[in-house]
Curated annotation (Swiss-Prot):
Its cofactor is Zn(2+). It is found in: Cytoplasm. Keywords: Aminopeptidase, Cytoplasm, Hydrolase, Metal-binding, Metalloprotease, Protease, Zinc. The gene is pepT. This is Peptidase T. Cleaves the N-terminal amino acid of tripeptides. It is an enzyme of class 3 (hydrolase).
Length: 410
């Protein structure tokens, strides 16, 4: 498979789990280790303009092989894996010619079952790369990295026409910092694609508007034996606060274009409690209303408290729906759709119920929709990717590059 699988297996051997709440970028040393290994690989493969920034963003270029002017385009993937599940000592399992039924993950009781994951019914006969049940796999987004590099290596060998192609591998995407230090001007592409999606055919240019909501609740602790009229239990207030958040609008109750409120963490004592929510909505007006709801709940629950006891809400916008930017450049989507169809893939246009580096970059002047990788069930032990899906992603990347050149030909 032209080293595609070998590349992927090599990349997932690096522990690149990012870490929230860390000021430095990248947030973990493992990401820099992978970046340096990729830098060396790109040098050996003959790529040009290879730059590794101090924040761990690796960029490189494949120069045009045609005489006419072609818009420079880019392909981007991220090096980190989710902080929500271990990415250390990943031990991939390779199952060729999947015949259906449960797949044992390692030697324990963990299985990958089509009962829980019906998509497996569509993958009979495919080669599946799974976890051993102890870690995530890292197809999000090391499959994307392997696909981009493999596609460009094949482009060089095939002599298919293409213009200048830029590539970038970013750190800390999973914690929302992937594009924070991305130099759009130096990248010098007219548009780009993140290769960070899921199943074959996924093409995404809509994502959530996102905000982080910190709720600080200050109570008053006294001996419970003499607490009447004096104690203000911050934990009780925290419970009341959460009871006012619409239960039917949680992640486990929503899908498609529905937004949600998600209680991500809570901790506390009688004296103080802290709740962390994330709020998401595709519609900008709905997004603003959700943030206002969080403020309104605080006002309602905190009404009548002693001045020394209070509920404080801090809201920080994280990213916005890139549709606002990408839909101004419809040819970018049309190009990707045509490339997929040319590769016998029917595009599956769907909203991203999350975010990507592309969301940030689109608002920095680099329109950047998202392409599939062939992976499934990200951020956990049931994550897997198909080799056939990865091969199709490689083909689509190559076809996008070729079509861009052909359409620019005088």
């Amino acid at each position: 498979m032209d080293k595609l699988l070998d590349r992927f297996l090599n990349y997932v051997s690096f522990d690149t789990q990012s870490k929230s709440g860390v000021r430095q970028v990248p947030s973990t040393d493992g990401q820099l280790k992978l970046a340096r290994a990729l830098q060396q690989e790109l040098l050996e493969l003959g790529f040009e303009q290879i730059v590794l920034s101090k924040q761990g963003c690796l960029t490189a270029a494949l120069p045009s092989n045609v005489a006419w002017s072609v818009p420079a385009i880019g392909f981007i993937s991220h090096m980190d894996t989710s902080p929500d599940f271990s990415g250390k000592n990943v031990n991939p399992q390779i199952l060729e010619n999947y015949r259906g039924g449960d797949i044992a993950l390692g030697v324990g009781d963990e299985v990958l079952s089509p009962v829980m994951f019906p998509v497996l019914h569509q993958l009979l006969g495919h080669t599946l790369i799974t976890t051993d049940g102890k870690t995530l796999l890292g197809a999000d987004d090391k499959a994307g990295i392997a696909e981009i590099i493999t596609a460009l290596v094949r482009l060089k060998k095939s002599q298919l026409p293409h213009g200048d192609i830029r590539i970038a591998f970013t750190p800390d995407e999973e914690i929302g910092k992937g594009a924070q230090f991305f130099d759009v001007k130096a990248f010098n592409a007219q548009w780009a694609y993140t290769v960070d999606g899921g199943g074959v055919g996924e093409l995404e240019y809509e994502n959530f508007n996102a905000a982080s909501v910190q709720v600080k609740i200050v109570g008053n602790n006294v001996h419970p034996g003499s607490a009447k009229g004096v104690m203000v239990n911050a934990l009780t207030l925290a419970s009341r606060y959460h009871q006012h958040v619409p239960e039917s609008e949680s992640p486990e109750q929503t899908e498609g274009y529905q937004g949600f409120y998600h209680l991500h963490s809570m901790k506390g004592s009688v004296e103080r409690a802290d709740l962390h929510y994330i709020v998401r909505d595709f519609d900008r007006n709905g997004f603003e209303q959700r943030k206002q709801t969080m403020l309104d709940i605080a006002e309602k629950v905190g009404a009548g408290l002693h001045p020394d006891c209070y509920i404080e809400v801090t809201i920080t916008d994280t990213y916005y729906n890139m549709r606002e930017q990408v839909e101004q450049h419809p040819h970018i989507i049309a190009l990707a759709q045509q490339a997929m169809r040319d590769c016998s893939i029917e595009p599956n246009m769907k909203p991203i119920r999350g975010g990507t580096d592309g969301a940030h970059l689109s608002f920095q002047g680099l329109p950047c929709p998202n392409l599939f990788t062939g992976g499934y069930n990200y951020h956990g032990k049931h994550e897997f990717v198909t080799l056939e899906g990865m091969e199709k992603a490689v083909s689509v990347i190559m076809r996008i590059a070729e079509l861009t050149a052909l359409r620019a030909k005088p």
